[in-house]
Amino acid sequence: MNENDKMKIKEVIVVEGKDDTKRIQMAVNADTLETRGSAISDETLDQIEDLYDKRGVIVFTDPDFSGEKIRKIITEAVPGVKHAFLTKHDAAPSHKGSLGVEHASPEAIREALAHLYTEVPDGEPLISREDLAVAGLTSGPQAKEYRRRLGEYLRIGYTNGKQLYKRLKLFQITPDELKKALEYIKNEDNY
């Protein structure tokens, strides 16, 4: 695929490192900003805020603890950024190593960028904690597995029970979206 055929991304994509940048640029025509780890400097946060005001920002970090930490730091400093998520499967290395954007296929990257979420920090919860409990997502023998599958299906990343409520609220996932996802993830034939 030549440069002219690649999907063009207007926003700046925030990634963790230079290998992530290389992989993103194989998949799409986009500018990136690298955090160079989870200890994000005030200068980098200022750059992200400036880019958000001028072009918009997409946070695209690894589906691991460090990636979630970076995502949280940026979200708190610059509310309203967009988020792209890879599944752990899509970010797995072919041999040894840790999960990372740098291991994802161009197709997986384009798919993640096609399903962006924008935070609504002050949004009203559309789904209650009780809804999550009744669905078996916060307790019970299958809760962890159901949350993993739900995170993959909705492309919002893996969360624990408490984080799930916050993330569904943050991204304004509707009861209908949750119901459709639950029907899919609880069908063992899909996994």
UniProtKB/Swiss-Prot annotation:
Single GO BP term: rRNA processing
UniProt similarity note: Belongs to the ribonuclease M5 family.
Alphabetized NCBIfam families for the sequence: 5S_RNA_mat_M5 (TIGR00334)
Gene source species: Ligilactobacillus salivarius (strain CECT 5713)
Reactions catalysed: Endonucleolytic cleavage of RNA, removing 21 and 42 nucleotides, respectively, from the 5'- and 3'-termini of a 5S-rRNA precursor
Manner of cofactor binding, per the entry note: Binds two Mg(2+) per subunit.
Broad class of enzyme this protein falls into: hydrolase
Location relative to the cell: Cytoplasm
Keyword line: Cytoplasm, Endonuclease, Hydrolase, Magnesium, Metal-binding, Nuclease, Ribosome biogenesis, RNA-binding, rRNA processing, rRNA-binding
Amino acids binding Mg(2+) 2: 62, 64
Protein name: Ribonuclease M5 1
Native organism taxonomy: Bacteria, Bacillati, Bacillota, Bacilli, Lactobacillales
Record EC number: 3.1.26.8
